[in-house]
């Protein structure tokens, strides 16, 4: 029975282009997971979009003398294009400035407020001393009063996991200009997190399948749970849906509150765009559906504590949650099943920093290198379990010594020889025990790699796939069919047949990781259709007449299945080309020189 799998991907912020460190944390792992489950025949809904509200966007707009909407429009397109070119197979990649998102966000706010889970409190708001604008909590840094970490943020300390307010920090400073923020009394709305403390503690304690860092960080956060501000004094954001704020532009819903709601609103938008307006309920109110959230480690508690609290408070109510007389009447929205958090990627030993030039944007990278080469590196050497460093030397080494030399070499030597000598899948003779052993080992990879992917252990899964490819290379080197063909044509045909079957199975195994090259290989092997076909952009017209673009794809047409090879004898091959490009080591110095020029 196919499962309903929600793949909820962190929303990239639309105040600039995204760099490779961003997609290492949320994009590539989520896409690998989604593609695997589609191949398994499960019903996948992968959603996200650009996060377009808040002070950072207004700061860029002020600097350029334009509007926040213009900035959001620009970077929504740039980011969408980057994710398309990287092959991230969203069912819907949308944005938070749609009428649908506003409606869903306001419905959740209103419902939580009516149920007493949103309260009013007077607090000290942080404002920039130079611009007078509200400073988001994450734009304020200082020393943690509990552990002494000197880069604690205004909402939490990433070192000890404590929940903080900007006023808690010792020597707070603005990340915008380095100046101390100005604190002024102001009234805000707060999500009453302590009201959910017991439920959250019991629920998190039951999540034995979570990564230890996610579970421990979340439990630690619960120790000092307090109400969380969900509004800010600014003009750019989702309006507060209460009568007294109908004509006020000085206070809006805080960007973090509406961003996490985006997972739900994007699912609802997908259903509307597909002509099945209630289809989203199959993922959100189906007790058998499973939700997987992908993000960097700095967003853990938003997905393990704050968003679950909002879901618990909303339950089955509100305009969207209610399904009177329907299949899901009275069934609450589902909580996360797993929160897959990645660590941080650094670059040449330093933190990514756009302002300091320590960065390479996705579009810049893909203008010179293949998407699958980047996807390979970010998976095999990425920050899955610990902070890792991207260096150009390591990227070139991994590409040449692993991707090209192992998997690329196996495909090239097999297909080029078979195409030259047979033109189609050859008729094998009797299989020897050695033939059967290598076939069985690769066939077993469907299960072993699949289990690792299902557990979100992407690095181990890719390493196992590469190990299997290496085993087939060893088999060919030992059997030497290019020599055997001179004296025993049938035996050579058998060896190449076995190699083709292994390559065909490995093609499926590599597809979630390397979709572009896997699709080309699929075609070289004589197949038609898509196992990892093209994505597409669609223009969507909202009820208010506005249009926006969504990244999506017709994934139901994909023909791949997570199964061993069924490559038929006699299938005509297409002329193959090498799957990957070997990189000249001179690119290392060229790229380091580019980075140095950005540093000035």
From Swiss-Prot:
The family this protein is said to belong to: Belongs to the class-I aminoacyl-tRNA synthetase family. MetG type 1 subfamily.
Organism lineage string: Bacteria, Bacillati, Chloroflexota, Chloroflexia, Chloroflexales
Known EC number: 6.1.1.10
Gene source species: Chloroflexus aggregans (strain MD-66 / DSM 9485)
Span of the annotated motif 'HIGH' region: 12-22
Cofactors required: Zn(2+)
Binding positions for ATP per the UniProt entry: 354
Matches recorded under NCBIfam families: metG
Keyword terms of this UniProt record: Aminoacyl-tRNA synthetase, ATP-binding, Cytoplasm, Ligase, Metal-binding, Nucleotide-binding, Protein biosynthesis, Zinc
Protein name: Methionine--tRNA ligase
UniProt binding sites for Zn(2+): 144, 147, 157, 160
Complex and partners: Monomer.
Its job: Is required not only for elongation of protein synthesis but also for the initiation of all mRNA translation through initiator tRNA(fMet) aminoacylation.
Catalytic activity reported: tRNA(Met) + L-methionine + ATP = L-methionyl-tRNA(Met) + AMP + diphosphate
Principal subcellular localization: cytoplasm
Motif segment ('KMSKS' region): 351-355
Cofactor binding, per record: Binds 1 zinc ion per subunit.
GO cellular component, one term: cytosol
Short name of one Pfam family: tRNA-synt_1g
Encoding gene per record: metG
């Amino acid at each position: 029975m196919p499962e309903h799998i929600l793949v909820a991907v962190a929303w990239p912020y639309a105040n600039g282009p995204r760099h490779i460190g961003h997609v290492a944390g949320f994009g590539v792992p989520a896409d690998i997971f989604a593609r695997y489950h589609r191949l398994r025949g499960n019903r996948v809904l992968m959603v996200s979009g650009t996060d377009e509200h808040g002070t950072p966007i207004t700061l860029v707009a002020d600097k350029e003398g334009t509007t926040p909407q213009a900035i959001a429009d620009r970077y929504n397109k740039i980011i969408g294009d980057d994710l398309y070119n990287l092959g991230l197979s969203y069912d819907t990649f949308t944005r938070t400035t749609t009428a649908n998102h506003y409606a869903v966000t306001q419905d959740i706010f209103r419902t939580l407020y009516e149920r007493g889970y949103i309260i009013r409190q007077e607090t000290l708001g942080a404002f920039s001393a130079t611009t007078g604008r509200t400073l988001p909590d994450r734009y304020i840094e200082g020393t943690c009063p509990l552990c002494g970490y000197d880069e604690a943020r205004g909402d939490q300390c990433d070192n000890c996991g404590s929940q903080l307010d900007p006023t808690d920090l010792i020597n707070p400073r603005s990340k915008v200009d380095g100046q101390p923020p100005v604190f002024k009394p102001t009234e805000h709305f707060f999500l009453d997190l302590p009201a959910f403390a017991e439920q959250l503690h019991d629920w998190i304690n039951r999540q034995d399948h979570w990564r230890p860092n996610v579970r421990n960080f979340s439990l630690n956060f619960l120790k000092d749970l307090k109400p969380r501000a969900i509004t800010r004094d600014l003009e750019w954001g989702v309006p507060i849906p209460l009568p007294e704020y109908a004509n006020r532009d000085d206070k809006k819903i805080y960007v973090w509150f509406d961003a996490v709601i985006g997972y739900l609103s994007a699912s609802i938008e997908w259903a509307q765009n597909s002509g099945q307006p209630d289809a989203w309920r199959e993922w959100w109110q189906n007790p058998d559906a499973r939700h997987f959230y992908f993000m960097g480690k700095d967003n853990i508690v938003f997905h393990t504590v704050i968003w679950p609290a909002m879901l618990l408070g909303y339950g089955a109510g509100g305009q969207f949650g209610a399904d009177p007389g329907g299949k899901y009447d009275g069934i609450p929205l589902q909580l996360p099943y797993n929160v897959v958090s990645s660590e941080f990627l650094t670059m040449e030993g330093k933190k990514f920093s756009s302002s300091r030039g320590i960065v390479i944007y996705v579009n810049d990278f893909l203008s010179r290198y293949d998407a699958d080469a980047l996807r390979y590196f970010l998976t095999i050497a990425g920050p899955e379990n610990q902070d890792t460093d991207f260096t150009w030397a390591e990227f070139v080494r991994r590409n040449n010594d692993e991707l090209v030399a192992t998997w690329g070499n196996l495909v090239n030597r097999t297909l080029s020889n078979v195409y030259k000598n047979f033109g189609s899948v050859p008729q094998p003779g009797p299989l020897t025990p050695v033939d059967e052993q290598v076939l069985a080992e690769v066939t077993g990879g469907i299960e072993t790699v699949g289990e690792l992917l299902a557990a979100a252990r992407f690095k181990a899964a890719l390493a196992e796939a590469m190990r299997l490819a290496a085993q087939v290379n060893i088999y060919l080197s030992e059997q030497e069919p290019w020599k055997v063909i001179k004296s025993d044509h049938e035996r050579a045909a058998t060896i190449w047949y076995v190699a083709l079957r292994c390559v065909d199975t490995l093609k499926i195994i590599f597809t979630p990781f390397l979709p572009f090259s896997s699709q080309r290989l699929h075609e070289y092997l004589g197949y038609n259709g898509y196992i990892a076909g093209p994505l597409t952009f669609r223009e969507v017209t909202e009820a208010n007449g506005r249009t926006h673009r969504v990244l999506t794809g017709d994934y139901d047409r994909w023909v791949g299945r997570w199964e061993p090879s069924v490559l038929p004898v006699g299938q005509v091959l297409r002329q193959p080309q090498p799957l990957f490009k070997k990189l000249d080591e001179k690119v290392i110095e060229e790229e380091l020189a580019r980075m140095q020029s950005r540093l000035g």
